[in-house]
Swiss-Prot record:
Gene Ontology process terms (BP): translation
Pfam entry (one): Ribosomal_L28
NCBIfam families for the chain: L28 (TIGR00009)
GO CC annotation terms, alphabetical: ribonucleoprotein complex; ribosome
Identification of the protein by name: Large ribosomal subunit protein bL28
Keywords, alphabetical: Ribonucleoprotein, Ribosomal protein
InterPro entries in alphabetical order: Bacterial_rp_bL28, Ribosomal_bL28, Ribosomal_bL28/bL31-like_sf, Ribosomal_bL28_bact-type, Ribosomal_bL28_sf
HAMAP family in alphabetical order: Ribosomal_bL28
Family stated for the protein in its record: Belongs to the bacterial ribosomal protein bL28 family.
A GO molecular-function descriptor: structural constituent of ribosome
Length: 63
């Protein structure tokens, strides 16, 4: 569970890189995860959160 957001569950997505010669190679796109000290269930914990969850206010940062 290392590349998964702990709030929304967003994880890696898979697909192909396609060249001009139409060659296809498998690739992986990972979410932009940040380690954040956040308040969860009344205690401060370090969690991995995607930047979309941070920007939209789903995480309350610990001061």
């Amino acid at each position: 569970m290392s590349k998964v957001c702990e709030i929304c569950g967003k994880g890696p997505s898979f697909g192909n890189n396609v060249s001009h010669a139409n060659n296809k190679t498998r690739t992986t796109w990972h979410p932009n995860l940040q380690k954040v000290k956040a308040v969860r269930n009344g205690s401060v914990k370090t969690i991995k959160v995607c930047t979309r969850c941070i920007r939209s206010g789903h995480v309350t940062k610990a001061v």
